From Swiss-Prot:
The modification Phosphotyrosine is found at residue 690. SUPFAM superfamilies: p53-like transcription factors (SSF49417), SH2 domain (SSF55550), STAT (SSF47655), Transcription factor STAT-4 N-domain (SSF48092). This is Signal transducer and activator of transcription 2. CDD domains: SH2_STAT2, STAT2_CCD. Residues 316-486 are annotated as: Interaction with SFTSV virus NSs. Residues 138-572 are annotated as: Mediates interaction with USP18.
């Protein structure tokens, strides 16, 4: 819906404002309405505010041409007499602006601004009243373009009809001219004079029709130019969206609609080009002095050809940027020797029936003159041919699926070396495509380029290479600037923050909220930063160590992203992981909650680690906050985080293990928060011969710690410490996660059901791993073994002979009763049922976090 059409649908108060606006305007309302689409399509802002007066002058004369054309159309309709009069009057009224066309541009530009202001006021009023909002011009552009295409097709049909009538008129003239030439009689012959008069009238009518056809072709070309001016910005929008999508922005960037529009526009231009050729032929058959077709057709044809070439050149695009199949989430990174894919497309879907189109690919057509800049060759075939049959069925699409790059050797032997000012991951390379396009006699070489790619030689460089891709596509205004990292610009947080969130939303499904982004902002710029939109340098993003973990910021963040994707995706997407929380914020959150409240946050001191912190309130009103040593992917590969949380044990003062993790922040019971992620629960009614084994995590609490808990500093002192020294790693519980298996306690049917619910033995950890198949028990009488003297009295009747094989690695005397020993979700087919494994002891005391 055009802006003027939306204004007509406004309520009375806003309609009154519109009438008042045009009551003092030189532009009449009826002309504003009749030329609404054309007026709104022109760039009045550039003409009014630009420093180049030529744009205002050109727009002024285009306006006059449009008025004259519309006036000519109205002259054929008797009912449009009033409109025709107003068009002519306005055309005369604006003649004085020929001396200063900028004034006319300013007048219309200000009118459009006032219209938009009235429209915005009306939309706000509708929002306050709860009414549906009017459709904005941006949302209606698709309808606008399609409507224009329909109008152009109608104009084209009319032009075809006019040319047909012109041919008939020219045939009449030729016939009369030949008759006149044959019957040569004295000039005083009345009949001859009459014939000459008729011939002259026929020539005058022919000249008139030629001018009308030429004017119609000019008007059609003007409308086509406007259509192309609408389509090309749409294509630029798509390219900008594609660039952002390459760095994982959530944007839909399909090309099907653009292909339909570009093809329709090209068809109209090619058709007009053919009609101009017909007019040229008519001019060659019959030519006379001041023939409008003699120069007019050549001029129109040149304009059409130029517009077609411009459209075709822009219509050849890279639809899918280069990407390796093994890293689909990180395009624009290529590895030497590895295959990658890329797709090009011509949006003008017109191909000769007998012409195949071949695209050639090359790399670094115009490489930068930098010392040490690497050079590459395309190892596989650098051509792709599209037959007419495939082009008609799938479109003009060239899929390169097996391209491979190899580095050129420098000197006589060995690989090329990179000793220039740029690192390997800062070199930018451009892959180019060329196709020789031919259609209806028009031949043109079309070229297009990919976005700059980073070429690595080892997958260990993938992370920092992605940082380069992210930085370039976020900040570079020039997509061909291969020397971007010679002097990389700083990134404003307003751009960088959303881009970091895109990495999570695209790769794991959920982006970063405002609190998480705020933590990252403080980590990069400090809590004292008061700048509204601070700037971050490339070195600070990827190279400079970031306290407290002594890791570059991007390395730290990318390792977390990898950890979440591989092991924590469901927990992250469901909001169970708070994640990016500073230690000071962690303390502020937990100290106000009940004992046992915990949260999950990413460690700031390890590469890809997640830790669990919980609060304990002492009897003397002291608050202690503990953090477990971070779990990395090596740990989580053996035991899911949800199972660690479920079965985590902390030894109390009486040396009895208990789980201190009771409520997920703010107050969600642990099993309610994580129950849906637990492994399959065990049927407690099932009778088993052996106790299942499972991995659990247990931390020791030292006696002196229990007797003398550390007192947390008051909040002001804490904040002062942060401002002066920065955050330092908190004391954490060191965990050695090691699965310990115990096999084959033959308890007998009498004691088994009792011990399943009461016995949970704990043994001293050891690196020894034993797996022993235990035979089925004999169904005959069982002799009573002599009990071990160190066993508890309630276990001395057990047969411990089959357990001798564990004597070197298991201390039976440390087995302790502690609840149900069965771990849910175990496979009962091929595992050895053993007693519950021991805790994983810590290599240091459990200390409260300083923050």
């Amino acid at each position: 819906m055009a802006q003027w059409e939306m204004l007509q649908n406004l309520d009375s108060p806003f309609q009154d404002q519109l009438h008042q606006l045009y009551s003092h305007s030189l532009l009449p309302v009826d002309i504003r309405q009749y030329l609404a689409v054309w007026i709104e399509d022109q760039n009045w802002q550039e003409a009014a505010l630009g420093s180049d007066d030529s744009k205002a002058t050109m727009l002024f004369f285009h306006f006059l041409d449009q008025l004259n054309y519309e006036c000519g159309r109205c002259s054929q309709d008797p009912e449009s007499l009033l409109l025709q009069h107003n068009l002519r009057k306005f055309c005369r009224d604006i003649q004085p602006f020929s001396q200063d066309p900028t004034q006319l541009a300013e007048m219309i530009f200000n009118l459009l601004l006032e219209e938009k202001r009235i429209l915005i006021q009306a939309q706000r009023a509708q929002l306050e009243q709860g009414e549906p909002v009017l459709e904005t011009p941006v949302e209606s552009q698709q309808h606008e373009i399609e409507s224009r295409i329909l109008d152009l097709r109608a104009m084209m049909e009319k032009l075809v009809k006019s040319i047909s009538q012109l041919k008939d008129q020219q045939d009449v003239f030729c016939f009369r001219y030949k008759i006149q030439a044959k019957g040569k009689t004295p000039s005083l012959d009345p009949h001859q004079t009459k014939e000459q008069k008729i011939l002259q009238e026929t020539l005058n009518e022919l000249d008139k029709r030629r001018k009308e056809v030429l004017d119609a072709s000019k008007a059609l070309l003007g409308r086509l130019t406007t259509l192309i001016e609408l389509l090309l910005p749409k294509l630029e929008e798509w390219k900008a969206q594609q660039q952002k999508a390459c760095i994982r922005a959530p944007i839909d960037h399909g090309l099907e609609q653009l292909e339909t529009w570009f093809t329709a526009g090209a068809k109209l231009l090619f058709h007009l080009r053919q009609l101009l050729k017909e007019l040229k032929g008519l001019s060659c058959l019959v030519s006379y002095q001041d023939d409008p077709l003699t120069k007019g057709v050549d001029l129109r044809n040149a304009q059409v050809t130029e517009l077609l070439q411009r459209l075709l050149h822009r219509a050849f695009v890279v639809e899918t940027q280069p990407c390796m199949p093994q890293t689909p989430h990180r395009p624009l990174i290529l590895k030497t020797g590895s295959k990658f894919t890329v797709r090009t497309r011509l949006l003008v879907r017109l191909q000769e029936g007998n012409e195949s189109l071949t695209v050639e690919v090359s790399i670094d057509r115009n490489p930068p003159q930098l010392q040490g800049f690497r050079k590459f060759n395309i190892l596989t075939s650098n051509q792709k041919t599209l037959t007419p049959e495939k082009g008609q069925s799938q479109g003009l699409i060239w899929d390169f699926g097996y391209l491979t790059l190899v580095e050129q050797r420098s000197g006589g032997s060995g690989k090329g070396s990179n000793k220039g000012p740029l690192g390997v991951t800062e070199e930018l390379h451009i892959i180019s495509f060329t196709v020789k396009y031919t259609y209806q006699g028009l031949k043109q070489e079309l070229k297009t380029d990919t976005l700059p790619v980073v070429i690595i030689s080892n997958m260990n460089q993938l992370s920092i290479a992605w940082a380069s891709v992210l930085w370039f596509n976020l900040l570079s205004p020039n997509l061909q600037n291969q020397q971007f990292f010679s002097n990389p610009p700083k990134a404003p947080w307003s751009l960088l923050g959303p881009a970091l969130s895109w990495q999570f939303s695209s790769y794991v499904g959920r982006g970063l909220n405002s609190d998480q982004l705020s933590m990252l902002r403080n980590k990069l710029f400090g809590q004292n930063c008061r700048t509204e939109d601070p700037l971050l340098s490339w070195a600070d993003f990827t190279k400079r160590e970031s306290p407290p973990g002594k890791l570059p910021f991007w390395t730290w963040l990318d390792k977390i992203l990898e950890l979440v994707h591989d092991h924590l995706k469901d927990l992250w997407n469901d909001g169970r992981i708070m994640g990016f929380v500073s230690r000071s914020q962690e303390r502020r959150l937990l100290k106000k909650t009940m004992s046992g409240t915990f949260l999950l946050r990413f460690s700031e001191s390890s590469e890809g680690g997640i830790t669990c912190s919980w609060v304990e309130h002492q009897d003397d009103d002291k608050v202690l906050i503990y953090s477990v040593q971070p779990y990395t992917k090596e740990v989580l590969q053996s035991l899911p985080l949800t199972e660690i949380i479920r079965h985590y044990q902390l030894l109390t003062e009486e040396n009895i293990p208990e789980n201190p993790l009771r409520f997920l922040y703010p107050r969600i019971p642990r099993d309610e928060a994580f129950g849906c992620y637990y492994q399959e629960k065990v049927n407690l009614q099932e009778r088993r011969k052996y106790l299942k084994h499972r991995l659990i995590v247990v931390s020791n609490r030292q006696v002196d710690e229990l007797q003398q808990p550390l007192e947390l500093k008051p909040e002001p002192e804490l904040e002062s410490l942060e401002l002066e020294l920065g955050l330092v790693p908190e004391p954490e519980l060191s965990l050695d996660l090691e699965p310990l298996l115990k096999a084959g306690l033959d308890l007998g049917p009498e004691l088994e059901s009792v011990l399943e619910s009461t016995l949970e033995p704990v043994i001293e950890p050891t690196l020894c791993m034993v797996s022993q198949t235990v035979p089925e028990p004999d169904q005959g009488p069982v002799s009573q073994p002599v009990p071990e003297p160190d066993l508890p009295c309630d276990l001395r009747h057990l047969n411990t002979e089959p357990m001798e094989i564990f004597r070197n690695c298991v201390k039976i005397e440390e087995i302790m009763p502690n609840g149900d020993p069965l771990l849910a979700g175990q496979n009962t087919v091929d595992e050895v049922y053993v007693s519950r494994p021991s805790h994983f002891y810590t290599d240091g005391p459990l200390m409260p976090s300083d923050f």
